[in-house]
């Protein structure tokens, strides 16, 4: 299955045709797709209307510098701010993180979008792409926040996606623009980077997004192309039964598998359920690549939200999913 990107704030005729394809599981939205709350809700409705089956609509609405929807949405803090607070007041920090998850999920749902790819559970150890997106550099602290965040997302009616497996935080390179390799053995990764993923899986996380990082002492290819990482370790040893997403095949670190078709096939052959094709110019070739493949068309049904909350209900605070008044932690919009 493919999760595709579209070019603008409205669907083109070609994009409507793409959504008819059996291999298209849904759409991932970016800043380029956002103009206002009303517009993104209308775009979400148009995506669903164009597809002959239920589809998944996703976004990266983490907070901080990775927040695609801004005007009319709450200004969400980066996750690192909660880790910093944890040293002074752990209970308050965890409560704030739960409120952050609840608010983010509720606003995203109110826009007709099913899920944000969250939380980031990488360790914050200097990676250029991760930075303040990580809760902490300490595995147990990240694990504690991961449990809380997953539970809060579920309370707000959103599936939780742990990223970027098996851990992106220790390598320096940004895989959007460069190849990355982590030389540590599996035993060290299990004692450090995998700890938050174990916690998230135990908390009931619904999905995992793979990293385009090579761990040569474990497998020779990037993790998203590796049956060893996906089938043997994530599913076999760690017992994960949810959906596995690739990271975007337009990122530089994915190019090791060759052209567009090679990247799509490498992810699916390794055990990814869904391949992210975020750049519209790569969609047609990706669709051609999956012709004739047997695809798990039911894999994403559990990730599709329980229906849009609606902004009126959100602002009135009447939805039953709220367990903490949002005003207790947040009250501003960007």
UniProtKB/Swiss-Prot annotation:
The gene is nagZ. The keyword Cell cycle applies. It comes from Xanthomonas axonopodis pv. citri (strain 306). Substrate binds at residues 60, 68, 133, 163-164. Keywords: Cell cycle, Cell division, Cell shape, Cell wall biogenesis/degradation, Cytoplasm, Glycosidase, Hydrolase, Peptidoglycan synthesis. GO terms for molecular function: beta-N-acetylhexosaminidase activity. Belongs to the glycosyl hydrolase 3 family. NagZ subfamily. SUPFAM superfamilies: (Trans)glycosidases. It catalyses: Hydrolysis of terminal non-reducing N-acetyl-D-hexosamine residues in N-acetyl-beta-D-hexosaminides. This is Beta-hexosaminidase. Pathway: Cell wall biogenesis; peptidoglycan recycling. Plays a role in peptidoglycan recycling by cleaving the terminal beta-1,4-linked N-acetylglucosamine (GlcNAc) from peptide-linked peptidoglycan fragments, giving rise to free GlcNAc, anhydro-N-acetylmuramic acid and anhydro-N-acetylmuramic acid-linked peptides. GO terms for biological process: carbohydrate metabolic process; cell division; cell wall organization; peptidoglycan biosynthetic process; peptidoglycan turnover; regulation of cell shape.
